[in-house]
Amino acid sequence: MTDYTPDETPGIALRDISKVYSSRTGDVVAVHALTLAVRSGEFFSLLGPSGCGKTTTLRMIAGFEEPTTGRILLEGRDVTDVPPHRRDVNMVFQNYALFPHLTVWENVAFGPKRKKLPREEIRRRVGEALELVDLVGREKRRPDELSGGQQQRVALARALVNRPRALLLDEPLGALDLKLRQAMQLELKRIQREAGVTFVYVTHDQGEALTMSDRIAVMNAGRVEQLGTPREIYETPSTPFVAGFIGTSNVISAPLARIEGAIALLATSADERVLVPLRVPVPPGASISATVRPEKIRLSLHPPDGDRCRLLGVVREVVYLGTATQYVVATSVAEQLVVYAQNDGTADLVPAPGDRIWLWWRPEHGYQLIHADATDVPEEAAP
């Protein structure tokens, strides 16, 4: 899977890299043959559940793991056999590994000092790095005198002061509380944009990936299921796994009734109507799976007019979420469809459990899934 034109040199290029671990019980494939390109200056995220191969991929880029097959290129230079300290990349971990006995300034200056840069150059670089991460004025503090977010920024400054071609981040926000984590997401994106450095960010948190990334590779079982922008990944998931892992998604499966141009009409009861724009051809009588996001569905006491998709259902659960109310509705094509209704004070319909209700949405808000087996959605993707 490549995503760059021939005249471009990607910041990081992975060419058919794989990683196989051997043991007495047999081989374990952590990463299957993987080819992708990260553009220079891009904020690129590897997103997926535990055990999907994202951290192994990052460690192969860093040089901490040797790929079983394939090549790794950094700005056109093959670094597959180059040791980590000579790859011109730096890595930031969830455990920031700051030196507790050194001040902020001394922690950040550690790398340039090891490179034996001139004293004035060290002073200039450290000053620029501290200004970039908004730590000017805290140079003399030690790590135990800093908050978790400040410690994280010290780790970033220490990595960026060496001016790497790429910065690799392995779930660096995982140890922070929710509010601080959300604030640091915006900070990380600002720092990346101002530094102009390629970021490769590993996370299992879909919110982090959607908030910060220019592009996301969604990984599952050692493979990339989908590569795209946050909007593409969320609005047009390619597989049931991606649909289930990114946000909350409803998967609808039903036999094909007929095709009208590029639109499939699914087999439902006479009063119901489900239309799905086709991405790939479907043979007559085949089952089609499609996804529609909960916020795209509307509720009504009566079937809507026109060509809107519509299903009759029974409300099973009503959950107040603050900004929205979640309705779980049983229908003929899905045991449960989730609907989000915004609590903006304009709703004239407030269904209760047991009520019969119509659900409707625009056909263009449904998206055909390539793999029809909806059971591919993992349990850990549940909201």
From Swiss-Prot:
Domain ABC transporter: residue ranges: 12-246
Disulfide bonds: none
GO molecular function: ABC-type putrescine transporter activity; ATP binding; ATP hydrolysis activity
Coiled coil: none
Catalytic activity: ATP + H2O + polyamine-[polyamine-binding protein]Side 1 = ADP + phosphate + polyamineSide 2 + [polyamine-binding protein]Side 1
Signal peptide: none
UniProt keyword Nucleotide-binding, yes or no: yes
Subcellular location: Cell membrane
EC number: 7.6.2.11
GO cellular component, one term: ATP-binding cassette (ABC) transporter complex
Amino-acid positions noted as binding ATP in the UniProt annotation, renumbered to this chain: 48-55
Alphabetically ordered keywords of this record: ATP-binding, Cell membrane, Membrane, Nucleotide-binding, Translocase, Transport
Topology in membrane: Peripheral membrane protein
Pfam families named among the record's database cross-references: ABC_tran (PF00005), TOBE_2 (PF08402)
Function, in words: Part of the ABC transporter complex PotABCD involved in spermidine/putrescine import. Responsible for energy coupling to the transport system.
Protein family membership: Belongs to the ABC transporter superfamily. Spermidine/putrescine importer (TC 3.A.1.11.1) family.
Summary of subunit composition and partner proteins: The complex is composed of two ATP-binding proteins (PotA), two transmembrane proteins (PotB and PotC) and a solute-binding protein (PotD).
Protein name as it appears in the record: Spermidine/putrescine import ATP-binding protein PotA
Source species of the chain: Acidothermus cellulolyticus (strain ATCC 43068 / DSM 8971 / 11B)
Record lineage: Bacteria, Bacillati, Actinomycetota, Actinomycetes, Acidothermales
Gene that this sequence comes from: potA
